[in-house]
Regions:
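C-terminal transmembrane helical hairpin of 12-TM major facilitator-type secondary transporters
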Residues: 273-318
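Cytoplasmic membrane-interface "Motif A"-like loop-to-helix N-cap segments
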Residues: 66-76, 268-281
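Helix-loop-helix hairpin linking two adjacent transmembrane segments in secondary transporters
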Residues: 135-181
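Conserved MFS/SLC helix-loop-helix module at the cytosolic interface between two early adjacent transmembrane helices
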Residues: 55-91
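C-terminal ends and interior cores of transmembrane alpha-helices
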Residues: 78-92, 282-295
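Helix-to-loop junctions at the C-terminal end of transmembrane segments
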Residues: 56-68, 259-272, 357
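Extracytoplasmic gate region of multi-pass secondary transporters
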Residues: 24-25, 208-253
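Cytoplasmic helix-loop-helix junction between adjacent transmembrane helices
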Residues: 100-138
Length: 398
């Protein structure tokens, strides 16, 4: 298979496998009303997807050091499909919904990084960083399509129908990869315990820097994606929106695709660490600006694409930097640690946003939305400020 066909196949399969990714955020106001959920309970529901990811990623990603990543990807599509179908057939309250969301999140753990591993194992060329950028930016396409289809199907046929569709499409992705992606036998490496290999990877300072950056990135990204529809729904109570909240959310997510690709190009052509630092500072400031405009729909709609582009401008740069700092023997373990940290933050962020909303006056309070949105960028600002302090702090006088 040519490199072009390979990247096309894996990007298409990734987008299909993510059909359930934004289903809960897109339908969160409906689910809150149906099951009478508070903001923090809604945050738990949104975060349970990433809890399933975190529980599964260490094993599934590390497994790609020993078996063909294609096989792990197929397992992931099965979990993603079964989780959403289980939500369709059996979810009836917060606990059951969280359970099936966790299964769906485990499916992402089996598709996203293992899919990237399947790609990088088959493309060892100087173009690899660009292929990585295309693959990681497809995450945004999958998220946008999930928002759009979940919102449209949920509005037209009811929320259960949206989860039914979200369960079918990952199974189709698995079928395509099973039929079209050639199997590959990985080079055998000495078998060490999963935790030992991940600890060895984490002791690498370059890997550790990328993991910390990814934690801050995912805190902001997944907190934003979990609550953007609810934020726009609040804005719509202040003044009429030009489109539905889910349609605007889907369009905003599309801005992340060119931002991720162009951000990686900037990192390749310049200083990667400096690029990531600038992006984190920008997104941290824009997080507070987004919250400030929450009660002014037109200004909010204007700033959201800029903010989301800033969130995504370091995504591919971080991932490509991680891959560049690993070798074939430890890449799976490094990806496991990287994903565990990032998606662990992605699990906590939606919950913390919900807690802040409840504590600061609820989802009808402008102050609550200011604090909630500002909290999304706090770790990017902390990390960037710490890096700048280390770089420019005066040496102690002796």
């Amino acid at each position: 298979m040519t490199a072009f066909r390979l990247i096309l196949l894996m990007c298409f399969a990734e987008a299909l496998s993510m059909a359930g990714f934004s289903a809960v955020p897109a339908l969160l106001p409906v689910l809150q009303n149906t099951w009478h959920l508070s903001a923090w309970q809604a945050g738990v529901l949104g975060g349970s997807y990433f809890a399933g990811y975190v529980v599964s990623i260490s094993w599934l990603s590390s497994l790609t050091d020993h078996v063909d990543a294609r096989r792990v990807f197929l397992l992931g599509t099965a979990l993603a499909g079964l989780g959403s179908l289980g939500f369709y057939f059996l979810a009836h309250d917060l606990v059951s919904a969280c359970l099936f969301q966790a299964v769906t999140g485990a499916g992402l753990a089996g598709t996203y990084m293992p899919g990237l591993r399947a790609l990088t194992d088959r493309i060892e060329t100087s173009l690899q960083p660009r292929f990585i950028a295309f693959y990681t930016s497809t995450f945004g396409i999958g998220a946008s399509l999930s928002y759009a289809f979940s919102g449209w199907v949920g509005t037209a046929y009811g929320w259960p129908a949206a989860f039914c569709l979200a369960g079918i499409l990952p199974l189709l992705a698995g079928l395509l990869v099973w039929r079209l992606l050639p199997a590959q036998h990985p080079v055998p490496h000495p078998r060490l315990s999963m935790f030992k290999t991940q600890w060895v990877a984490l002791k690498n300072a370059e890997i550790r820097r990328h993991v910390l950056g990814y934690c801050a990135h995912c805190w902001e990204l997944f907190g934003f994606r979990a609550w953007i529809v609810a934020l726009l729904t609040y804005a719509g109570t202040q003044s009429e929106l030009p489109l539905s909240a889910t349609a605007i959310a889907a369009l905003v997510n599309l801005f992340g695709i060119p931002a991720s690709i162009l951000g990686n190009e900037a990192a390749i052509r310049g200083d990667r660490h400096r690029h990531i630092l600038r992006v984190m500072l920008a997104s941290g400031v824009l997080a507070w600006l987004t919250g400030f405009f929450a009660s002014t729909p037109w200004l909010l709609i204007a700033v959201l694409p800029v903010y989301f582009a800033a969130i995504m401008a370091d995504s591919a740069a971080l991932t490509a930097g991680l891959v560049a700092s690993t070798n074939a023997q430890n890449r799976g373990s490094a990806m496991a640690v990287y994903s565990l940290g990032g998606f662990g933050a992605g699990f906590i962020a939606p919950v913390m946003v919900g807690v802040l909303l409840d504590l600061a006056g609820g989802q009808k309070s402008a102050l609550a939305w200011l604090l909630a949105c500002g909290s999304l960028g706090v770790w990017c600002l902390v990390l960037a400020t710490h890096t700048l302090w280390k770089r420019f702090a005066p040496s102690p006088i002796t």
